[in-house]
Amino acid sequence: MTLIPIVVEQTSRGERAYDIYSRLVKERIIFVTGPIEDNMASVIVAQLLFLESENPDKDICMYINSPGGVVTAGLSIYDTMQYINPDVSTLCIGQAASMGSLLLAAGTKGKRYSLPHSRIMIHQPSGGYHGQATDIEIHANEILRVKKKLNQIYEKHTGNSLKKIEGMMERDKFMDPEEARKIGLIDRVIAERTDIEIENIKVKQKVG
């Protein structure tokens, strides 16, 4: 069993204890860690919606360290990221594979980052089904439909052609952060927090 650290905070009403992840949510930081499945996705979606209700104009930062997981669970997080008003900055720590890489790429353009020793992997969806031939055909067609949809999402967020995406997704494609940047999955490789701060200043200067 993993022990989650508790943070004790002094307030005007006395001491208040938070688990470390809840305390970070107060700072608008969300963690997507471990396999992506329905229960975890529901928590992430709830956090995104809560932070939007708290302040619809302030960025949310999503840290990702995930091997991927269930496509429908991942897409529920993806759709919520696109649905809410705040920009969602994504940062890969460790790895972002499969659905994890899709969520990494789905961050707000210009605010998608990776730490230098992380690993990113993309591939086509997989699945299996046992049963009657007709049912197997139905599920095979569904996997192909999902594959097409995922390719279209990568196309939208990376700027690559659908044909190029299909080629890259044909087999497991492992990348270091710089390779991921070159194909548009992320915008920048960062080593220190100040790298993001400098980037934000540059963006503000361009807007101004």
From Swiss-Prot:
Annotated Pfam families: CLP_protease
Entry annotation: catalytic residues: S98, H123
Catalyzed chemical reaction(s): Hydrolysis of proteins to small peptides in the presence of ATP and magnesium. alpha-casein is the usual test substrate. In the absence of ATP, only oligopeptides shorter than five residues are hydrolyzed (such as succinyl-Leu-Tyr-|-NHMec, and Leu-Tyr-Leu-|-Tyr-Trp, in which cleavage of the -Tyr-|-Leu- and -Tyr-|-Trp bonds also occurs)
PROSITE patterns: CLP_PROTEASE_HIS, CLP_PROTEASE_SER
Cellular localisation: Cytoplasm
Keyword Protease in record: yes
Keyword tags: Cytoplasm, Hydrolase, Protease, Serine protease
GO biological process: protein quality control for misfolded or incompletely synthesized proteins
Record-linked InterPro entries: ClpP, ClpP/crotonase-like_dom_sf, ClpP/TepA, ClpP_His_AS, ClpP_Ser_AS
First-level EC class: hydrolase
Domain of life: Bacteria
GO cellular component: cytoplasm; endopeptidase Clp complex
Record EC number: 3.4.21.92
GO molecular function: ATP-dependent peptidase activity; ATPase binding; serine-type endopeptidase activity
Function: Cleaves peptides in various proteins in a process that requires ATP hydrolysis. Has a chymotrypsin-like activity. Plays a major role in the degradation of misfolded proteins.
Family to which this protein belongs: Belongs to the peptidase S14 family.
Subunit structure: Fourteen ClpP subunits assemble into 2 heptameric rings which stack back to back to give a disk-like structure with a central cavity, resembling the structure of eukaryotic proteasomes.
NCBIfam families reported in the protein's UniProt record: clpP, PRK00277.1, PRK12553.1
Classification via PANTHER family: ATP-DEPENDENT CLP PROTEASE PROTEOLYTIC SUBUNIT (PTHR10381:SF70)
The protein's name in its UniProt record: ATP-dependent Clp protease proteolytic subunit
Protein source organism: Wolbachia sp. subsp. Drosophila simulans (strain wRi)
Recorded name of the encoding gene: clpP
